[in-house]
Amino acid sequence: MRDVIMIPISNDEDLVIAADNSGGVGQKMFDYVKVDYETVAYYGLRVALSECLTVGAKPLAIVMQNLIGEEEWSHLQKGCQTLFSELKCEPIPITGSTESNFKMVQSAFAIMVIGKVRKADIKVRKTPSHAKFACIGKPLCGGEVIEKKHEIGPLPIIKKLLELPYVFEIVPIGSKGVQYEWKKLCEENKLDYCQITSTEIDITKSAGPATCFLISFHPDRTEDIAKAAGGHFFQLNTK
């Protein structure tokens, strides 16, 4: 299954919960990657929101766990607002908690997205045996996320692809890489492929904060998918 929990709340709908976290990323003394806190929240929300959207859910609320400091809350919120603007969507209500009793020497942050999906609209286990596969965006991690952000698969493009009837499934890629998520997708859909290859991207590399997405689609629509994804489309070959 995906990195989400789906809880039935009626005969027709499921509650969807997705989460992400980061540690050692920020502006504190012992942080490994130095970035501002708007960026920390932006990418954290991007991961959790991606997980929610790609199973077909509508996000309803965001919960932030801020172990950075009280002053940073507004910066974290601003990072979330940046993503809302990018997606051209209404702001999602945000709540959460801040560690204000102790000063941390290393940044820690977690974020949860809560959404809802009609059971008939769940986009899981929808990939048929004749499907083709591609990666949207390149796998990046650590400092690469900032240095090569132009190579990240844009979330507005993913949102657009989710609306196309010839796109079967989209899976955000995390730290275990494209190959791992592809194998999971094949297992869920009972597909008999042995492996995938790519001459353009490293399919075993961590994709950090979901910098790329695995997509399954109708084989007759390769050109349409490539056009919609712009320069972010990378064909995956199956055996």
Can you annotate each of these PLM segments?
Residues 1-239:
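Helix-biased detector of long, well-ordered alpha-helical tracts
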